Amino acid sequence: EKVTVNYGEVLDYKHETIDKLVSGVEQLLKANGVTMLKGTGTLLADRQVKVTFAEPAEDGATESYYDAEHIILAGGSYPAKLPVEGMELEGVLTSDGLFALKEIPESLTIIGGGVIGVEFAEVFSALGCKVTILEALPKLLANLDKEISQNLKMILKKRGVDIHTGASLAKIEKDPAGGLICHYTEKDKDQSISSQYVLCAVGRKPNAAGLFLDPEEFADIAENSAALTTKHLEAAAQTAHDLGITMERGFIETDIYGQTGAPGIYAIGD
């Protein structure tokens, strides 16, 4: 009865768990004879990779070059944001930023009713946060069976989550009283909701462009993939094309074996 959560300890446990997992993987790599370098890799011609070190090496070197018969590109992904006014405001978060908060939000509006959005809705509503989901499509978890979607919607509503489907976000603005206001359209009616924070959970984008961009020339994305612009994508696509690799909307095209258009160069990941 009246159970509360020490959110600080929850975050400490999360960080400790992540650190243990990362350390464990690093030890496995080392035990299997894998050399690990910390830095930014850039693919060059003739199956060569330039590595710009995160910190200078013991000899003072800031970069090095490596040649290989086979190269695997695994750039991962980063949280996407909608091209909507107000997305840049303080308090509008992605999944990366939400768990960086030091305390449980009093209220949270989640843009997106996909897997990521629903997961965070369940977690933060259980922690005592007032959660609202705005989903543009007619139902939650649009890629899943209708029955699953309906059951999850009922479960979330019983837990106090407000759900608005068919809700198209128009803009986000600062609330004079504090927090943020999301303006959206639902059933042809203009609506708005205020909350302490807004989570943009509309999927993820491929993080491949940086593999083809010189980190010194495009320093703004070396530490922040979300800073990618059309200019970056076009430059990356052109460089990739020159290497025999095709990119489409940031994705690297491969054949059924995961090989790109350049012999010996493969791409993996989601």
Question: Which residue ranges define each predicted feature?
Answer:
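A structural signal for the hydrophobic beta-strands that form the central parallel beta-sheet
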Residues: M36, L73, T94, I163-T165, ...
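Glycine/Thr-rich phosphate-binding loops of Rossmann-like dinucleotide-binding domains
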Residues: G39, K81-P83, E119, F124, ...
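Dinucleotide-binding/catalytic capping subdomain of oxidoreductase cores
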Residues: K2-V34, I133, L152, R159-I163, ...
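Core beta-strand elements of the Rossmann-like FAD/NAD(P) dinucleotide-binding domain
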Residues: E58-H70, D188-Y197, G261
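Feature captures the FAD/FMN-dependent oxidoreductase FAD-binding
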Residues: V5-H70, I163, A170-I181
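Rossmann-like dinucleotide-binding cores of NAD(P)H-dependent redox enzymes
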Residues: L11, E16-V22, E26, F99-A100, ...
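FAD-site-proximal beta/loop scaffold in flavoenzymes
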Residues: E88-I104, Y197-D270
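Short glycine-rich anion-binding loops that position phosphate/pyrophosphate groups of nucleotides
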Residues: T42, S77-P79, G203-P206
